[in-house]
A protein has these predicted regions:
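Short, intrinsically disordered N-terminal pre-domain segments
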Residues: 2-11, 124, 128-130
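Glycine-rich, low-complexity segments
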Residues: 4-47
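Extracellular attachment/recognition segments
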Residues: 34, 38, 42-130
Length: 130
């Protein structure tokens, strides 16, 4: 019984060491879980998201919460329409993406012609950070 606690600690250390062998689990490296946020994973994957408030400018620059490694990332977004909005929107054109920002074209078409949208915009970007 004298060495019971030492043996117990040794057994726990051995079990922990064996359970960690061959583990390829992807860990969260850092994160910011706000409305405009990101999650960085240990394998280099970076997922970012955010919302852009309405604007009357035809092109709006959206600054990413953190920078990507390069410009080979994908952006997906959607217009958040008001109930009375009868305009027609297509995929939003993206202009000159950089590692820390992208520009979004806010034009639309309607039965009375074309114009600049004041609608809110929600987006998500996926790429790498290392």
């Amino acid at each position: 019984m004298i060495y019971f606690s030492r043996k117990l600690v040794a057994i726990i250390v051995v079990i922990f060491a064996q359970s960690s062998l061959g583990t390829n689990a992807i860990q969260v490296n850092s994160q910011s879980l706000g409305q405009n946020g990101y999650v960085k994973y240990s394998n280099g994957l970076l997922i970012q998201w955010g919302k852009q408030p309405g604007s009357t400018a035809s092109t709006v620059t959206i600054y990413l919460p953190t920078s990507f490694y390069d410009t080979n990332y994908v952006i997906h977004g959607c217009i958040i329409k008001d109930a009375y909005d009868e305009n027609v929107y297509t995929a939003t054109s993206l202009v000159n993406p950089t590692v820390s920002s992208f520009k979004m074209d806010r034009n639309f078409g309607s039965s009375s012609g074309t114009g600049v949208s004041r609608a809110k915009y929600s987006w998500m970007a996926i790429g790498r950070w290392k």
